[in-house]
């Protein structure tokens, strides 16, 4: 009983039927906990641009790609930044998912996608919404509801990391593929952790089931979904079958002899206790490839951005020969600053996973509602929406010149990165943005 007793308090809560469903958590993100609301002038634009990005992904790659991208913490954070939301706070999760739910659901039949759930009371409506969708599509509603509840149960119970879930979004395709984006908060540390799940990328529900997670370094955490924790899970299940009086007696002995000490935990090999390593290059902490921890500071700093990549974006917008993007530049009112935004939007659509390790860079598309790195340039934002919308509509009719131009913005930036040394002067770039903020319709909350 010795090694089992230390885990007794978890026994009841962890009696879950893990292996019945094949799903995986793709990762997590840790974020500073912020309060406040997104103003209507930004929320509506986030909905428009976010929906257009989703539509572009569906046209180019299919709806499964949308689910896979939403299950990537780094891509999700970059999407929120390019939409003009505060680049690193907990609010990016709520605002992006609200924008996508508004935009995608009104075109659910066309897209073959629907967003369920939300924050607080809306998260509790997820089962009802899933059953409704199941009736409309012929999918197994009870299985979907069970999956939704299990993903929430794992992140709220099986992983003892101190975060209480308050948001749960279940994104479902009409073919039964899905992604989950949910978030918990820790009031004591004023941090939030966003968890990502995806049905496509998993082998076993209870062994490393997450595709990724985003959050602040909280030191040691208990992860009972890792493969290495199998002996621990088995011990817990066995403990749950023992006589309660016997277990209580043994627990008392453990407490009296101080067996449940920090030193014994440090040497325990049966459960995964790990310390999140700090990055030497940037204050954004990256580990397990797609997991992300955002820094506590509010302002965007040079260390948060890949300056070479930012330099390539600026060079694409301001220094590339105009005949490269002639079809775009014929759009009335479109100039280099809108090209800058469109280049970053293009990267969100066409970029590979390795492009999203510095989400802060994408805030140089449309700024941030709190003025970081600069106020949201509404005129530029609206121009970018119009150009992207026009390119999509024309591509549906067979006229792909504009959509090809938008794709070429990203490929041009890649070529500049490869063949030049376009490192941006961070302070001068910020000064330029702020000096022109009024002319571009800059606005903050």
Q: Locations of the language-model features?
A:
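Helix-hairpin-helix
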Residues: 303-309, 325-344
């Amino acid at each position: 009983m010795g090694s089992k007793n230390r885990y007794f308090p978890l026994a009841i809560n962890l009696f879950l039927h893990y292996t019945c469903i094949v799903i995986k958590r793709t990762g997590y993100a840790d974020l500073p906990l912020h309060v406040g609301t997104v103003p209507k002038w930004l929320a509506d634009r986030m909905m428009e641009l976010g929906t257009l990005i989703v539509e572009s992904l569906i046209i180019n790659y299919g709806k499964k790609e949308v689910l896979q991208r939403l299950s990537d913490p780094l891509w999700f954070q970059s999407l929120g930044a390019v939409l003009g939301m505060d680049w690193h706070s907990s609010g990016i999760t709520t605002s992006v998912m609200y924008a996508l739910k508004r935009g995608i659901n009104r075109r659910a039949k066309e897209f073959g996608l629907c967003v369920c759930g939300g924050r607080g009371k809306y998260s509790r409506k997820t089962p009802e919404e899933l059953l409704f969708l199941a009736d409309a599509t012929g999918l197994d509603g009870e299985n979907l509801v069970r999956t939704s509840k299990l993903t929430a149960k794992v992140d709220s119970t099986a992983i003892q990391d101190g975060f209480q879930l308050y948001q749960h979004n279940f994104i479902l395709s009409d073919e039964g593929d899905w992604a989950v984006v949910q978030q918990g908060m820790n009031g004591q540390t004023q941090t939030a952790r966003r968890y990502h799940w995806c049905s496509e990328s998993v082998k076993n529900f209870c062994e490393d089931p997450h595709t990724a997670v985003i959050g602040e370094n909280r030191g040691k955490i208990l992860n009972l979904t890792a493969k290495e924790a199998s002996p621990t899970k088995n011990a817990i299940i066995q403990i749950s079958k023992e006589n309660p009086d016997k277990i209580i007696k043994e627990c008392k002995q453990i407490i009296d002899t101080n067996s449940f000490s920090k030193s014994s935990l440090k040497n325990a090999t049966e459960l995964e206790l790990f310390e999140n390593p700090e990055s030497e290059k940037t204050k954004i902490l990256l580990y397990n490839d797609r997991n992300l921890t955002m820094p506590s500071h509010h302002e965007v700093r040079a260390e948060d951005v890949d300056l070479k990549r930012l330099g390539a974006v600026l060079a694409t917008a301001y220094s590339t020969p105009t005949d490269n993007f002639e079809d775009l530049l014929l759009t009335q009112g479109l100039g280099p600053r809108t090209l800058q935004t469109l280049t970053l939007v293009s990267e969100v659509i066409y970029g590979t996973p390795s492009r999203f390790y510095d989400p802060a860079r994408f805030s140089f598309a449309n700024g941030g509602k709190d003025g970081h790195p600069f106020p949201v340039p509404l005129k530029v934002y609206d121009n970018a929406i119009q150009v992207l919308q026009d390119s999509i509509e024309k591509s549906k009719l067979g006229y792909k010149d504009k959509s090809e131009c938008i794709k070429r913005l990203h490929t041009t930036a890649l070529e500049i990165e490869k063949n030049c040394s376009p490192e941006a002067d961070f302070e001068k770039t910020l000064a330029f943005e702020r000096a022109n903020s009024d002319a571009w319709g800059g606005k903050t909350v």
